[in-house]
Amino acid sequence: MNYRNIESVEQLYEMYNIKPVNMLTEKKGDGKADENVKQTTFLKDKLEVNYADLKEVSNIFKHIIVFTNDRDEKNNKTLKNIVEAINEFKKAKCEIIPELHVFVAADVDSKEDESEITIKDDEEEFVITEQNNTDTLVIARLGVQDEYDCEHIVKLLQDRGFLVLNPVQYAAIACNKYETAVLLQKGGIPQPNFTLMTKDILYDEKLFPEAMKEVFADWDVKDKDKNEDKEMVIKILDGHGGTGVFLTNGKKFYAVLQTIFAINPETQLIIQKKEEADGGDIRVHVLTLNDRQVILAAMKRVKLGGDFRSNVSLGASAEKVKLTPEQEQIALKTAKLSKMPWCAVDIMPLVKGSNKELGDNVVLEINASPGTDGISEVIGENFVRVLINQLKDPKEFYLQDKIAGYRESVTIDWGNGVKKEYLAKLDTGNGSSASHIEVGKYTEKGKKVTFTVEGKEFTFDIIGHSVAKTGNQEEHDRIIIKIPSLRLGLRQVNDLEMAIVESRDKSTNVLINRETLSNLGYVVSSRQTHILTPEMEKIKIV
């Protein structure tokens, strides 16, 4: 019997050879069948899916879209089981639970038509409208950021206001171990010393020793024998689940690197100094919302036998752990730095006094698509329910960073009824010290500056100066004022500090630097223009 032909709950039980157990009827003595009990039995016993969890999800989300990858085999099996169960319940006319749509990233395609977005792969086609952005959860699982078409779809949904776990631009950083390490370094998060390693660096007489000194300050360039006892961990940048990780030392590591690059010369690696761990590492699941953070769960992962890795997916055991205040602070700070709504932070406690510079704990990784193996058993309750219980108000997520083009239109409200639209360039990585705007001729007098907009004269206080370099490295002093209001897309920032410049022969009137973009909640696509706003001609300033 195929589930697509099922028309009743009784047929479900016949198909799966389930004898209905009606606990509620036995207590009440009314002899009536209870659909919820039947459904719960079917889900739990046959598909290992908890009906109560799905029911809780349905109170918040009517649609769940999952983008996944063939590499995520274990989780895909669970997801497909849930999809099958939901399809069967719909055919059997049972109680409504969320529509779940699972798309494999490598095969997915989309079509955008006004407010509708059609998503399809070899197995499914689903049409969703922008009106669904308040009742739809989008989950981007492992490997999605590797597929350009799928990445585009997720960004499209993200820009339309859909809740995405996790935004692909941040998940991509977390899935690259070197970029993660750089992010942690910028954020002042304690972590083992590290360096990037490629085949070109390995065989470069100057770059290789410089790289190794980033890992070991006392790395001896002349006497290699002095480096033999230095222990290090080598990781492939996009490895996951403990794969592509090697523990070695200064005596053997060169041969290990040569072997890896012989197999694939394009491989990129990160080398980390091996720190002295105090037992296994700790995985902390953190939910970061607009105005609050929640530690959902934590578990200590105990290594299996002689394996130095502590991944539960590799057979390591998990046990309950009480986080120290320092570990809580590190987990929360790291999660906020990642800009991902839900992530797992892997923290390794160090042997007391083993590294005075790092302290008692280091962060090993940030997981954008964390596995949940063992976590429910450790915390004594279903982890999915713990997560869902924190998602009571979807509006808490709607300030996720949106994608903007590198060229957009912005509107500035100067006050006194004057609003003007400008063509803006959005900083894609040059790191401009200040945003700036063309205002035409201006007059500086004392600590004030005056210029004209739309025929009206405006005077602003000078609050500072910035130094800008031109293409020929000449330095120019620029006056900084506070702009009353600037709007980009649907978002606005008030009292924005901007430098003013006279008219230049450029294609844009305004430059928005990265700090301002962050305040507005936008990240920039370096390949697209006018994602948020319609195209416009440059406005000439007279």
Residue ranges and their predicted role:
Residues 9-15, 46-47, 51-56, 319-322, ...:
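C-terminal active-site "lid" helix and adjoining low-complexity regulatory extension at the edge
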Residues 285-289, 348-352, 427, 501:
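Short beta-strand micro-motifs enriched in acidic
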Residues 15-25, 34-60, 64-68, 76, ...:
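Active-site nucleotide/adenylate-binding loops and adjacent lid/helix of ATP-dependent enzymes
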Residues 70-203:
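Conserved N-proximal alpha/beta basic substrate-recognition cap immediately N-terminal to
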Residues 241-329:
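Phosphate-binding site of ATP-dependent enzymes
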Residues 398-542:
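Pepsin/retropepsin-fold aspartyl endopeptidases
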Residues 215-223, 353-354, 407-420:
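A short acidic-Thr-Gly-centered motif at the start of a beta-strand
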